[in-house]
Amino acid sequence: MKIPFKPFILFHLTLFIRFILTPQIQYYIKSGGNHLSFLSRLFGPKPIIAKSRFITIEDTKTAPFTKKTVGSGYSMRPDVYYIVASVELGNTTTKCILTATNLNTSRTYLLDKTVKMTRDIRPPREREEVFGKTVWGVELTKEAVSELVRDTILESLRRAKVDIERDLDFVVRSTGVTAGFGSPEEVGKLIIALADGCLAAGIPPRKMAPALSKENIPERLREFCYLDRVIFDGAVASVIPPTGREVVANEMEGELVTAGIKVGSKWTNVDYRNPCVSLDFGTTLAGRIVNADEPYARTVGNFCGLAGAIPDAIIRGTEMVDCRGGAALDLYKKSILKGANWKKARRHAERIHDEIIDIRKVPANRKRFGTVPVDTEAAYSAGTTLIGCDAGKNGDKLPELTEIGHSIYQEDGIHTLFATLDHVSALIAKRLIDEAFEEGVIEEGSVLGVTGRAGITGTKPSLILEYVKDRFRDCIFVSDALAMGAAVMARCMNSMGTPHKPLGGRQNGPCILGMRRKLQSRKEDKWIE
């Protein structure tokens, strides 16, 4: 039966108004008028979010072939997975995340994600040396860190049913705990404590160091190993660090998240290769600005300072979380933003930024910015721009944020308070990017990648996208980028690549394996000047 055209159109228009447009208008009015209009919410650009995908260890062993991406049938090349453990000690959380990378497709999956709160680390015992503390003042000793790391690794391996000898290929250690250290070099003590924890969990040393030759690689992985053609020379996903000296104490975090966002983008249509910008909104801020040089891009900018510590300080004003180590994630749930007054939240966030949050190029005379040790001399002599975020000076206004959080909670409730946190984080991202463009360090055609709990939860992706959409070719939000970056680093250290699905090089460009071979074949003492 032929349906009359006009009634058909009217019927669907009525459905659109009744079930889509009307609820959006009602939400807009009820919320006090979010700066994102309901038309923007409906028809504006949507954030591209690459969420972690889980598989089991059995899946890595029983799925022998990869489905073709185009057309029907199967590729006759068997699937091979590279299993890596990322061990992370952060200011707020300590994690062991097990990843499995399909070396045919270059896609990385999660096997397990075990998370513990760093504040729950046991206190120092008699005769134990306190070598540092978290941004919240939680004291750390070598023995306590090792025990926490050991227990976290063993729990993760047990949950994922991963055997250390048979299944696990590599372990990468990293830390974002930098506030309690006097210099970037002192972070090395914490890395050693992490290594001791790995050894205590039964991880053999050979699984924490790169292979010296292809013969040291397990036989099932040798087909994907290029150690006989190129060696690891410090570049991770075709990006080299700023200088021979660390310019910020959490430099490794910036390196890993940049690589992790690259591998996370493989789940999307975004080509997140060079030039690119990364922002990691953990408790402390990390990230890089990368140019488009080949074969190795250079880090021309670093982000440092405070990030998630700012909303954490605000949320403590509710007195619903621990006054010392409490975090916004303790209270966060998907329904927390329902009923929020977004108009008020925006005003609260702007007040916080006007009165407390300091975002700028790090002055040359500073040894710390946002509690994070920095080496401005090394950075600026190498042509690397440091851009920092602080609350007052080295976090001395964090208590004021707690007072403001208490006031907002008392007057407007928990929902508007969390909406305020979203606006605060979005404005931090906006100001960081604005500062970088003013300094002229972001190349045209760059892609922005954002990760970290204070950058990808709630409505933060939509708010950030609204601010930066006209400045970048694309913008992508990736969960667990640090862990996926650890998987990339493990592959780079062992020269295990996927030339047909490259992570390195320029956007829309080919694999850089040939250029690397040509560069390394030169009889020079130094490949990277």
Curated annotation (Swiss-Prot):
It comes from the Archaea. To M.jannaschii MJ1451. It holds the Pfam family DUF2114. It comes from Methanothermobacter thermautotrophicus (strain ATCC 29096 / DSM 1053 / JCM 10044 / NBRC 100330 / Delta H). This is Uncharacterized protein MTH_1153.
